[in-house]
């Protein structure tokens, strides 16, 4: 009699083979590091201020962060903006994070120069006129003269009576800036030197009187006055990287440096 094939036997063999394959796969996975597994070696003494590990878990509205060494806040370009020491395995909440962000005692890297939006909040109060009727000569011994009703230029003069004479008024900053802030007025007039953009001629702006308080967009009337020996520099408050300058065959303007001439000699009592 022919033997009838045992279907259950085939199924058992198939199951047995799959079980062996499964065991092999399990064994392989146990001996293989997880893609998400991260391990850290012993920390060197010179690296103690660096962030070592960070584990995050959220429950409800509270974020629990566990730090082994410290937490740092970095900008997108990788520069460290804030650094805060925490105890080992310390858990902090959202309130703690808010306190860290607003803590004025944290180490914060400040920019070298403040944006104009911050400068616009500074108030400058007039103090007094500190110089009367002086002449400005550039490094080529050219004197500043009137080009027309609006603009100034520089020219070599035989008769200094043709040169523009200026008065200089001092202002005090509300942020207690150590720099000397001044306004330049053409003597015996109400015309004030007013800055524009780089390589644009400075304007002569007529006002009814010298401004008692200057803020915001009006800071284009003000300049930081610096002296180095006999050289005088006038940096625009509205554009802190630009100076009053003379330029060949051009009006007096704002410039960052050569080929424009940014240093001047002050000739006083030339009335």
Swiss-Prot record:
S-S bridge residues: none
Location of N6-acetyllysine modifications: 82
SMART domains in the record: IL1
PROSITE patterns, per the entry: INTERLEUKIN_1
Description of post-translational modifications: Acetylated within its nuclear localization sequence, which impacts subcellular localization. Proteolytic processed by CAPN1 in a calcium-dependent manner. Cleavage from 31 kDa precursor to 18 kDa biologically active molecules.
Modified residues (Phosphoserine): 87
InterPro entries: IL-1_alpha, IL-1_CS, IL-1_fam, IL-1_propep, IL1/FGF
Principal place of residence: nucleus
Region named Nuclear localization signal (NLS): 82-86
Cell compartments where the protein resides: Nucleus; Cytoplasm; Secreted
GO biological process: apoptotic process; cellular response to heat; cellular response to lipopolysaccharide; connective tissue replacement involved in inflammatory response wound healing; cytokine-mediated signaling pathway; ectopic germ cell programmed cell death; extrinsic apoptotic signaling pathway in absence of ligand; fever generation
Alphabetized Pfam families for the sequence: IL1, IL1_propep
GO MF annotation terms: copper ion binding; cytokine activity; interleukin-1 receptor binding
Entry-listed glycosylation sites: 102, 141
Residues linked to a lipid group, N6-myristoyl lysine type: 82-83
Function: Cytokine constitutively present intracellularly in nearly all resting non-hematopoietic cells that plays an important role in inflammation and bridges the innate and adaptive immune systems. After binding to its receptor IL1R1 together with its accessory protein IL1RAP, forms the high affinity interleukin-1 receptor complex. Signaling involves the recruitment of adapter molecules such as MYD88, IRAK1 or IRAK4. In turn, mediates the activation of NF-kappa-B and the three MAPK pathways p38, p42/p44 and JNK pathways.
Domain text: The similarity among the IL-1 precursors suggests that the amino ends of these proteins serve some as yet undefined function.
Complexes and interactors: Monomer. Interacts with TMED10; the interaction mediates the translocation from the cytoplasm into the ERGIC (endoplasmic reticulum-Golgi intermediate compartment) and thereby secretion. Interacts with IL1R1. Interacts with S100A13; this interaction is the first step in the export of IL1A, followed by direct translocation of this complex across the plasma membrane.
Family the entry assigns: Belongs to the IL-1 family.
Protein name in UniProt: Interleukin-1 alpha
Highest classification ranks of the organism: Eukaryota, Metazoa, Chordata, Craniata, Vertebrata
Record gene name: IL1A
């Amino acid at each position: 009699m022919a033997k009838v094939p045992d279907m259950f036997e085939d199924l058992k063999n198939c199951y047995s083979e799959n079980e062996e394959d499964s065991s092999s796969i399990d064994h392989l996975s146990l001996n293989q590091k997880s893609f998400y597994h991260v391990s850290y070696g012993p920390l060197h003494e010179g690296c103690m201020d660096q962030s070592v590990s960070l584990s995050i878990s959220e429950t409800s509205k509270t974020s629990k962060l566990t730090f082994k060494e410290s937490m740092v806040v970095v900008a997108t370009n990788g520069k460290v903006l804030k650094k805060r020491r925490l105890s080992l395995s310390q858990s902090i909440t959202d309130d703690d994070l808010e306190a860290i962000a607003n803590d004025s005692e944290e180490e914060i890297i400040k920019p070298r120069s403040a944006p104009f939006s911050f400068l616009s909040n500074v108030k400058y109060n007039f103090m007094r006129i500190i110089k009367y009727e002086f002449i400005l000569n550039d490094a080529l011994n050219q004197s500043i003269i009137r080009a027309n009703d609006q603009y100034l230029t520089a020219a070599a003069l035989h008769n200094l009576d043709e040169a523009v004479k200026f008065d200089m008024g001092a202002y005090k900053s509300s942020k207690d800036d150590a720099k000397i802030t001044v306004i330049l007025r053409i003597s015996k007039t109400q015309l004030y030197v007013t800055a524009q953009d780089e390589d644009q001629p400075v304007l002569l702006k007529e006002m009814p009187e010298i401004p008692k308080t200057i803020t915001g967009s009006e800071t284009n009337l003000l300049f930081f006055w610096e002296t180095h020996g006999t050289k005088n520099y006038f940096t625009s408050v509205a554009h802190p990287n630009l100076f009053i300058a003379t330029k060949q065959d051009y009006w007096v303007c704002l410039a960052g440096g050569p080929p424009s001439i940014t240093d001047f000699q002050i000739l006083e009592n030339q009335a």
